[in-house]
């Protein structure tokens, strides 16, 4: 795994964060060192996908990057047939994913699409995964995507959503930021790397509160939802489409 040193030297000005070839080449290390409980989150998501997947439906991984969820899910499914569509707008990420799939027995079960997630026509899904993706969409497109996901899910289907979140109280938000910075320092990032990456992500990654996410899910039609994993300013959610309208 190539180490993330993208922000280790001073940059003036600091460029806006972009999912380019440089980021794609170190993304596994970046995720492990920047996203608390990342491995636990996607491991349990892969298990949930196995439990909720229905024959002859689709799993969508929207914002799939270089395929960590898909690789785990494929191994969890083993010999059980499944169909997955991975979508990402970054050509370098999709290319990395393709390379990883080449050696896997389940490579034909996963179709990769290089496009913006909001451009895709979704349908016949029993599982939709959206990991650290909604936060990069413009605010006016988020409601539409969640509504489209709800429509695409079969009754009883699930949405698995992980996001960086804001605390509604500014003093608690400050605590979250402090502990998140500590987490990154504990994982070997310098103060320069932390501050420059924060600047690079400003106005690129726009988080929301848990309450906003939950309200959006409810507006779309999800009547059952839960935060199943949370670490300060990161949260993983599950939302279930009713088996029957009004249930």
From Swiss-Prot:
Disulfide partners: none
Q: Give the catalytic activity.
A: prephenate + S-adenosyl-L-methionine = carboxy-S-adenosyl-L-methionine + 3-phenylpyruvate + H2O
Stated family: Belongs to the class I-like SAM-binding methyltransferase superfamily. Cx-SAM synthase family.
Gene, per the UniProt record: cmoA
Sequence positions that bind S-adenosyl-L-methionine: 38, 63-65, 131, 198
Instruction: Write the protein's name.
Output: Carboxy-S-adenosyl-L-methionine synthase
Q: What does this protein do?
A: Catalyzes the conversion of S-adenosyl-L-methionine (SAM) to carboxy-S-adenosyl-L-methionine (Cx-SAM).
Example GO BP: tRNA wobble uridine modification
Its EC number(s):
2.1.3.-
Superkingdom assignment = Bacteria
Q: How does it assemble?
A: Homodimer.
Q: What class of enzyme is it?
A: transferase
SUPFAM superfamilies, per this entry?
A: S-adenosyl-L-methionine-dependent methyltransferases (SSF53335)
- UniProtKB keywords: S-adenosyl-L-methionine, Transferase
> In Gene Ontology terms, what is one molecular function of this protein?
S-adenosyl-L-methionine binding
């Amino acid at each position: 795994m190539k180490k993330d040193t993208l922000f280790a030297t001073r940059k003036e000005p600091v460029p806006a964060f972009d999912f380019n070839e440089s980021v794609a080449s170190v993304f596994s290390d970046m995720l492990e060192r920047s996203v608390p409980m990342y491995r636990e989150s996607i491991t349990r998501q892969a298990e949930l996908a196995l439990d909720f997947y229905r024959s002859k439906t689709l799993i969508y991984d929207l914002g799939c990057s270089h395929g960590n969820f898909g690789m785990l899910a494929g191994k969890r499914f083993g010999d059980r047939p499944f169909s997955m569509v991975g979508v990402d707008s970054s050509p370098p990420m999709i290319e990395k994913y393709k390379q990883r799939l080449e050696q896997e027995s389940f490579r034909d079960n996963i179709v990769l699409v290089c496009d913006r997630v909001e451009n895709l026509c979704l349908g016949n899904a029993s599982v939709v995964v959206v990991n650290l993706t909604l936060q990069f969409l413009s605010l006016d497109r988020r409601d539409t995507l969640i509504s489209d996901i709800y429509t695409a899910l079969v009754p009883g289907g699930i949405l698995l959503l992980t996001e960086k979140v804001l605390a509604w109280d500014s003093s608690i938000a400050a605590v979250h930021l402090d502990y998140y910075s500590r987490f990154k320092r504990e994982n070997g990032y310098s103060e320069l790397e932390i501050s420059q990456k924060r600047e690079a992500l400003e106005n690129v990654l726009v988080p929301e509160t848990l309450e906003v996410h939950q309200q959006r899910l409810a507006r779309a039609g999800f009547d059952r939802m839960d935060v199943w994993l949370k670490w300060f300013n990161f949260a993983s959610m599950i939302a279930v489409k009713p088996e029957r309208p009004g249930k």
